[in-house]
Amino acid sequence: MTFNDGVRGDAGRVRTSRGRRGMAIGGGLGGGGLIVVVLVMLLTGQDPAGLLGGGGGGDAGPGQDLSHCRTGADANAHTECRMVLTADALDVYWDGVMSEQTTGAYTPPGFTIFTDSVQTGCGAATSAVGPFYCPADSSVFLDLGFFDQLESQLGAQNAPLAQMYIVAHEWGHHTQHMLGTMESVDRQDTGPSGDAVRLELQADCYAGMFIGAAATTIDPDTGQAFLREPTADQVRTALDAAAAVGDDRIHESAGREVEPHTWTHGSAEQR
């Protein structure tokens, strides 16, 4: 999926940080993070204590400079700039949806691109956790290195729309948090029809809503649509990224028996 070259981005919308290695993450996160933790545990046998827990520490210093992320052309050329413009487009889209379909106002989530580790309201996280949403501070966290892992470890294509889908999925969790959905479900209810899976599938649906409307979501600064209409091949990359983190795919990749009663994110087909 391609941004229109002339649309404008706000580099200040996204925070960056560089942290220390060997930190851990506390409970309460939402989104892809937990599924990636499970994948690492299954494929490597790594002790989860290094990934999940209360962990201390904090950000070690400033992260990547985003001052060059100004236009859609920059977003098409650089992954970090694609994140900036995607955040801008998601904010405009969800502000419109919330104002038209709910009585509440849209509050943008925080968005941090981090390297190695990051301190959050849910605890301290390493890059191994993957992208996640932390409801405690209403923020999305992402290490750009995950996109390479998406292809090398999970078997999906590291393509622009796949990247945008991942971010839009985490924004979907923010929408659930704003609407009270995240807090009203039993996230310990696992299995194909359990609350945990339903929460993830709804976030997928919200991501699809954004992608479906992206070519008609208008940059208020230029009056142009943020994005061009996606091609069928581009849509396939997003669907493949969603399927790649299906619980059954992860079990199979680890050489384990597929156990539907343990699912928290849904099967590849569901996603």
Task: Give the positions of each predicted feature.
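Short helix/loop segments within enzyme catalytic domains
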Residues: C81-A87, D91-Y93, V97-T103, R198-I250
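Long amphipathic alpha-helical segments used for membrane anchoring, targeting, substrate engagement
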Residues: M1-H68
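C-terminal capping/extension segments of zinc metalloprotease domains
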Residues: P62, V97, G121-P135, D221-R271
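Post-HEXXH active-site segment of zinc metalloproteases
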Residues: H177-L201
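Active-site recognition of the HExxH zinc-binding catalytic motif
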Residues: L39, W94, L142, Y165-M178, ...
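Extracytoplasmic low-complexity, Pro/Thr/Ser/Ala/Gly-rich segments
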Residues: F3-R8, P48-I113
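Catalytic zinc-binding patch centered on the HExxH motif and its immediate surroundings
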Residues: A49-L52, S117-D143
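Short pre-active-site segment immediately N-terminal to the catalytic Zn-binding motif
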Residues: D148-Y165, G191-V197
